[in-house]
Amino acid sequence: MKITAKLTFTLLLILFITHGAAEERPIRIKAVGDIMLGSYHPEGFLRPDEKGSILNYIRPVTQDADITLGNLEGTLCDSGLTDKCEPDSLDCYVFRMPEIYGKDLKSAGFDFLSMANNHIGDFGSECVTKTEETLDINDIGWSGRPGTYGSKTIRGVDIAFIAFHSGGYCNSSLDMETAESLVSNLALDHDIVLVSVHGGAEGLAAMHLPDSTEYYMGED
């Protein structure tokens, strides 16, 4: 079975807070949305090993930047159980990618990845921790759990990355006071702060934001 990658855009906000750049040439940033490279669950949704990395096709694009970031829509975890979906469900999805795919993300040029989304907890806290460890091993900055952020110095510029989602297990996009405090504190020690927000309803009926609280599938 031929497996293709689909990188879809989520709501991504990039906030620049500068205190004097180390060089005159601008920092070039590229961002993609949801990244899901195949899943152990259900069976049969992993790429054939002999095909090589599915990211090979986009590597020339994602490598061509000073900073590349995206939203990791699932865990990097070789084992783990889930009770999120019924066994025969056709409208419930859980994603668990092999840990080895962390190397593919690194070779594709990703510097920061958001773990603040509705699929990072599909296989429980152990797989969240394993994903964090896998990204650390591959020197990819990440942000997800409350209070977490990534930090790198690139071309002499100190850069922070923080990600938000409406779920209670992430930096909350609904708690604006805390979000503002987190970003402001990062700005004190960094030249650039990148802010990623994963949220919003999907589908044709959600093309315009309401002037009120938005709900999707029962969630705020």
Model-derived regions: residue spans:
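Intrinsically disordered, low-complexity Ser/Thr/Pro-rich tracts
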Residues: M1, A21-E23
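Bacterial N-terminal signal peptides that target proteins for export
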Residues: M1-T8
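Hydrophobic h-region of N-terminal signal peptides that target proteins for export
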Residues: L12-A21
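Acidic, metal/ion-coordinating pockets
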Residues: E23-D220
